[in-house]
A protein has these predicted regions:
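Elongated alpha-helical scaffolds
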Residues: 78-82, 103, 109, 116
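Conserved structural core of kinase catalytic domains
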Residues: 2-80
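Short C-lobe core helix of eukaryotic-like protein kinase catalytic domains
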Residues: 81-95
Length: 159
C-alpha cells in the first residue's frame, strides 16, 4: 500500500482518512496541538457520518522535497540535519514509535530569519506504510546531495 494513496494533499492542507477512531491516540493529538515547540503541525479531526479524517494545516509551509530542489548552503544543511534529529525527540515525547513520516513530502519547512525549521505531521499507524530507518537514510542522503559546497558534500558522502 502506498502512503500517498490515503492522503489528499494540496498547498493549504493534508487530509488523511482514518479507518477507525480506535486508530487515533487522542492523548497524542492533544499533545500535538498543545505543544508547539515539538515541531508538529496542528491537527483537526473532521467527522462526517462514519468517515473520520485528520486535517493538517500546511498553509505557509514548504515540503522538504520542494526545498531540496535548490542547493543548500553549509549552514542550511546543518540546520536541516538538526531538524531531522528533532523527529526522534518527538517520537520519544509522544511515547509512540513510527508516528511521524520521514518522507520528504511529509516533512514541512518554514524559514525564520533564513534558518529552516522542520515541522512534522503526526500520522497514526505510520509504520504500516514504511520503515522509518530506511526513510531516514534516504532523507539524510537527499539533504547531503543538495549541499552546494562540494568539499562538505564529499566529506558527508564518505561517512
Amino acid at each position: 500500500m502506498n502512503m500517498e494513496d490515503e492522503f489528499i494533499i494540496n498547498n493549504d492542507f493534508i487530509k488523511y482518512k482514518v479507518n477507525s477512531i480506535n486508530e487515533i491516540n487522542l492523548r497524542n493529538l492533544e499533545v500535538v496541538n498543545k505543544n508547539k515547540q515539538l515541531g508538529l503541525i496542528d491537527i483537526e479531526i473532521e467527522q462526517f457520518n462514519e468517515d473520520i479524517s485528520l486535517i493538517y494545516n500546511t498553509r505557509g509551509y514548504k515540503t522538504l522535497r520542494d526545498y531540496l530542489l535548490n542547493p543548500l548552503s553549509k549552514e542550511k544543511a546543518y540546520s536541516l540535519l538538526n531538524c531531522i534529529n528533532k523527529c526522534y525527540e518527538v517520537q520519544s515525547y509522544l511515547l509512540d514509535t513510527g508516528i511521524v513520516s520521514l518522507k520528504t513530502n511529509f516533512i514541512f519547512l518554514k524559514e525564520i530569519n533564513s534558518i529552516p525549521y522542520c515541522y512534522f505531521i503526526y500520522i497514526p499507524n505510520t509504520s504500516k506504510y514504511h520503515k522509518n530507518e530506511e526513510d531516514f537514510k534516504k532523507l539524510i542522503f537527499a539533504v547531503i546531495i543538495s549541499i552546494e559546497d562540494n568539499d562538505l558534500r564529499n566529506e558527508a558522502l564518505s561517512l
